Every structure is written in structure tokens, then in C-alpha cells.
Amino acid sequence: MENKELLVKTIKKVYPSHLEAGITWFRFISAINYIKLAKRELELLSYINYRGTISSTSAKQDFCALFDSSIGTVTNMTARLLRIKVLVKEKSKVKVHPALRVDFDKELVIRLHIDTKPNIKTDDADK
């Protein structure tokens, strides 16, 4: 095993609200996992992460008022996010997948390990 130099990058960001921090978090998660999410879907994920669920009518109405959306749009986005497993149902409540939930009352530190493996080339001429 070859020894590689470890490179550490530190970026510190402060956000004015849990919702804005959540939008950035879900933008990051979607980018590293190649999941294309619309701006409104990022907002919905952030809102659900903060509130806990989007299942109640009052939660949907609150989201619609905050982000100038409609109940139909929330329903369609929720269905899509459930389909791609970013949202899950827990006891009939729609919530953010547990692996993606973040409590922004605590400081968040992310450790991302990125490595590369060179392509192994084979000589097809001998076959």
C-alpha cells in the first residue's frame, strides 16, 4: 500500500438560519451523490429537516407561506423525494432519511474522504 500525503481543507460557514444551513447541507449531499434536485426540493428538504415532518396540513401550509408554493407542488415534490429515498415514511409521517438528518443546534463537521484509483488497462491483443 502506497503512502499518500494527507491534505486537509477547512471551510467554516455561518448561516443566519437553520433553513439556510439546511439548504446548503442538502445541496452538498445532492452534489456528491449526483442527485439532481430543484431549488424548491432543497427548500422542502431543509424545511422537513428543521420541522421534523411535512405530513400535517399545517406543516404544508407553513411551507407554502414561507416559500410561496402550493400544496400540490409540495405533494408532488414529496412523492418524488420519497421515490428517490431522500425522504422516508416513519409511522405514517414523512421525514428526512435518518442518514441525512442534521441537527443545526449542534456544530456540524463533515469529513469527506476522496481518493482515486487509476484505471487498470488490460492487453486485449493476447485474447
What feature does the model see in each segment?
Residues R101-K127:
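Short, amphipathic alpha-helical interaction segments positioned at domain boundaries
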Residues L82-V94:
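A short, conserved structural fragment
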Residues M1-S17:
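General nucleic-acid-binding
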Residues I48-G52:
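Short helix-to-turn junction characteristic of helix-turn-helix DNA-binding domains
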Residues T75-A79:
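Short, hydrophobic-biased segments on the C-terminal half of alpha helices
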Residues S92-D103:
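Minor-groove-contacting beta-hairpin "wing" of winged helix-turn-helix DNA-binding domains
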